[in-house]
């Protein structure tokens, strides 16, 4: 498919609605306007007109908006037709437009892709459009809007600019080795490099917060049957999401709930009680439980406080701990504090946290919520923050590693050429975030995840 084609797509969700919008972008957008409207509307003014088919019969009537390029979202000529939101009407109008030469249905995300290719927005801003649409909380929406408005891109561009100045200084020192002053050892380059590294660390911290807002944390509640796992799921969710009975093994399959803690998405997964099961259905549920455990960001190891005084997970259930991935963080949750009389609260026990609560009464559950938020390093103050994706975090991490390696070359050997190369690679990693340096394959993956009309 050619980027010189004119594209059309429905910009509103499929199905019935009060308003349905078709968006057209490309060189033939003016021809579409003349064919469907009989005229070219005044730029950036709403014009109430009939929408006609090939025979001149009115299909619908509504508002037409004309945005001549380059002053449009895509940078191309753009026509928007806002009619009634009936699927039949919109389909008839769409088919009418597709009868015109060099007009085709847009690929997913192609409008945003053209905006990126025409320098109307960078790659991080383009991704922010999809993130704003998908935002699951007010904080996530605000942060996505900040990214769309260029907050994240500005921070990245400032880092790239600082690296450019540093590279110029380093390469000047390489090109003029006979100068009386040894620029590589006078401390100025190292001081500038330390400043860039500190700024990069600050951006990485903000990006981590943005990633948590976008993707959240996957928490699996695991333990023996009747430990109170489903009761805890209900307490965290604030509703009766899971059936709770005194019968061991009530939960036989994975249950999922999505909640927010101060804006951070939390994906809570309740699992079947872990034990040796003879029942085939329960056995399958237990295997699924282990699959979820192995993919979790954190495991809440649920313990019935009436059955043991132990607080060390290895003492409570050594077989469970032996199978658990060694790098997986766990929090031991001693349940039924309302029965045992244990003091509610949180404590650190060797390498893990221990929380005493009552899932039935809800006492101590707020402490668990705060613990989950803090364990991911999430802060609820997102004023001026931005949303970030995993690829952004990876690019920032790679840039940081290149700067660390570059500093080692500078401090240990005053190796200017090697430092310059590490600075270049760090700059390249950062440029991948905004799309200044990005492969076509990556662009394809990013924009294919967008809505058709975006």
Swiss-Prot record:
Enzyme class, spelled out: hydrolase
User: What processes does the entry annotate via GO biological process terms?
Assistant: tRNA methylation; tRNA wobble uridine modification
Question: What keywords would UniProt list here?
Answer: Cytoplasm, GTP-binding, Hydrolase, Magnesium, Metal-binding, Nucleotide-binding, Potassium, tRNA processing
Q: How is the cofactor bound?
A: Binds 1 potassium ion per subunit.
Give the domain of life.
Bacteria
Q: What is its EC number?
A: 3.6.-.-
User: Which residues are noted in the entry as GTP-binding?
Assistant: 226-231, 245-251, 270-273, 335-338, 358-360
Q: Which InterPro entries does this one have?
A: G_TrmE, GTP-bd, GTP-bd_TrmE_N, GTPase_MnmE, MnmE_dom2, MnmE_helical, P-loop_NTPase, Small_GTP-bd
Molecular-function GO term, any one: GTP binding
List cofactor names only: K(+)
Q: Where does K(+) bind?
A: 226, 245, 247, 250
List residues of the TrmE-type G domain: 216-377
Mostly located where? Answer: cytoplasm
Q: Which GO terms describe its cellular component?
A: cytosol
Question: Where do the annotations place (6S)-5-formyl-5,6,7,8-tetrahydrofolate binding?
Answer: 23, 80, 120, 454
Indicate where this protein resides in the cell. Cytoplasm
- The residues that hold Mg(2+) are 230, 251
Check the record and name the NCBIfam families matching this protein.
Answer: mnmE_trmE_thdF, PRK05291.1-3, small_GTP
* Family classification: Belongs to the TRAFAC class TrmE-Era-EngA-EngB-Septin-like GTPase superfamily. TrmE GTPase family.
Say what the protein does: Exhibits a very high intrinsic GTPase hydrolysis rate. Involved in the addition of a carboxymethylaminomethyl (cmnm) group at the wobble position (U34) of certain tRNAs, forming tRNA-cmnm(5)s(2)U34.
Listed under subunit, the entry gives: Homodimer. Heterotetramer of two MnmE and two MnmG subunits.
The molecule here is called tRNA modification GTPase MnmE
Q: Which organism is it from?
A: Pectobacterium atrosepticum (strain SCRI 1043 / ATCC BAA-672) (Erwinia carotovora subsp. atroseptica)
């Amino acid at each position: 498919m050619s980027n010189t084609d004119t594209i059309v797509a429905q910009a509103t969700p499929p199905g019935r609605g009060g308003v349905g919008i078709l968006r057209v972008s490309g060189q033939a957008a003016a021809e579409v306007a003349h064919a469907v409207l009989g005229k070219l509307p005044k730029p950036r003014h709403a014009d109430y007109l009939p929408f006609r088919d090939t025979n001149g019969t009115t299909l619908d009537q509504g508002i037409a908006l004309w945005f001549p390029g380059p002053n449009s979202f895509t940078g191309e000529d753009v026509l928007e037709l806002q009619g009634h939101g009936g699927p039949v009407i919109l389909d008839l109008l769409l088919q009418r437009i597709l009868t015109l030469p060099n007009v085709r249905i847009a690929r997913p995300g192609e409008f945003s892709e053209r905006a990126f290719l025409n320098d109307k927005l960078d790659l991080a801003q383009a991704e922010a459009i999809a993130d704003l649409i998908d935002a699951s909380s007010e904080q996530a929406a605000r942060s996505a809007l900040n990214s769309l408005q260029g907050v994240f891109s500005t921070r990245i561009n400032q880092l790239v600019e600082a690296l450019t100045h540093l590279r110029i200084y380093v390469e000047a020192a390489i090109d003029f080795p006979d100068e009386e002053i040894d620029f590589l050892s006078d401390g100025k380059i190292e001081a500038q490099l330390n400043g860039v590294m500190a700024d990069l660390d600050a951006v990485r911290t903000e990006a981590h917060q943005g990633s948590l807002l976008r993707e959240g944390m996957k928490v699996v509640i695991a333990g023996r049957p009747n430990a109170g796992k489903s009761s805890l799921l209900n307490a965290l969710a604030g509703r009766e999401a899971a059936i709770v009975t005194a019968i061991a093994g009530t939960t036989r399959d994975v249950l999922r709930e999505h909640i927010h803690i101060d804006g951070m998405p939390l994906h809570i997964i309740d699992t079947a009680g872990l034990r040796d099961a003879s029942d085939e259905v329960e056995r399958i549920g237990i295997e699924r439980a282990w699959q979820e455990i192995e993919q979790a960001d954190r495991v809440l190891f649920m313990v019935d406080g009436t059955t043991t005084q132990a607080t060390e997970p290895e003492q409570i259930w050594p077989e469970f701990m032996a199978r658990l991935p060694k790098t997986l963080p766990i929090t031991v949750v001693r349940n039924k504090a309302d029965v045992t009389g244990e003091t509610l609260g949180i404590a650190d026990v060797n390498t893990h946290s221990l929380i005493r609560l009552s899932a039935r009464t809800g006492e101590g559950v707020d402490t668990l919520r705060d613990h989950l938020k803090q364990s991911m390093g999430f802060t609820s103050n997102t004023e001026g923050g931005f949303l970030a994706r995993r690829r952004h975090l990876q690019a920032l991490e790679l840039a940081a590693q290149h700067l660390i390696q570059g500093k080692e070359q500078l401090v240990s050997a005053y190796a200017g050429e090697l430092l310059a190369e590490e600075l270049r690679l760090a700059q390249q990693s950062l440029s991948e975030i905004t799309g200044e340096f990005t492969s076509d394959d990556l662009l394809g993956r990013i924009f294919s995840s967008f809505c058709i009309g975006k």
